[in-house]
Amino acid sequence: MPQDSKNQIPQLAIKLQGGIGNQLFQQCFAEYLSQGCDLTLAYLVDGFSKDPYGRKNIVKRLLPNAIFLNQKDLVLSSCRLLNESVLQGTLDPVLLKALLSSQGIGTCILEGYWQDLRYISQQQIRSIKKSINDLKDRSSIMDYCDFQKKILESKNSIAVHVRRHDYKHHGICEEMYYIDSLNMIKNNFKDTNIFVFSDEPNYSDHFLRNAGFQTTITGCGDDLLDLLLIAQCKIHVIANSTYSWWGAMLSESICTIYPKPWSLVHQPSTTMFPVNWHAIEGAVQ
């Protein structure tokens, strides 16, 4: 189906919302459903016009040939909304297709964050990495290559993600979470180099250096390419952020540490984290 085509009504319409990490979860969920039951798919993008943080449609950068619509483009009389909050367990694509057919539903609108490993395949991970890699352009390639070289030359590169600006509602990781995590890593790995990715780089550099760690503040001005840099590190200390969750997931990480609780306002899926990741309790305030 051609991009932005409205000639064919999609059978599945996934609401895109949130930042890069959330949208990657939504993309994987959409592909899981559409491929599992052979239904036409579109992404609904109404929410970005009102996003309080000015977040953009990232999926369109990664999947330029996908279909992106506003809800007004759908025949609302034949639509049904299915919210993640009413589901128990995973959504089976075959059962969903049967439900649409039996109830005469033209388009099923799916709303949620779908943060679950069971919706993500290794093929999708490879595809996301390739799509991000293909985005490199002249404006960002020099900085990207400089940081990539430093990361690849490091025997045990550590990506540390410190996120603060828009996370006061969900809870912010304590400084001691990062310090304890890095001390644990230093006790288990030799020849480490710390690469810090942060929306407050000066703050992050200051408290980590005061704790005795030498750091490299890292970033090339493009959040998607920074995600690729995080993915090229071998060890990860992530924030309670789906952005750095994906940085670790896209990597061949030998050690990933994440904060617990993940959020002060909601409980994550019990199948959101790989079993070989290490949780640090009491990490979020």
Report the location of each language-model feature.
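Secretory-pathway luminal glycosyltransferase catalytic domains
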Residues: P10, F48-M184, N188-F189
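A short, glycine/small-residue-rich beta-strand->loop->alpha-helix junction that serves as a flexible
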Residues: L16-F25, Y167-G171
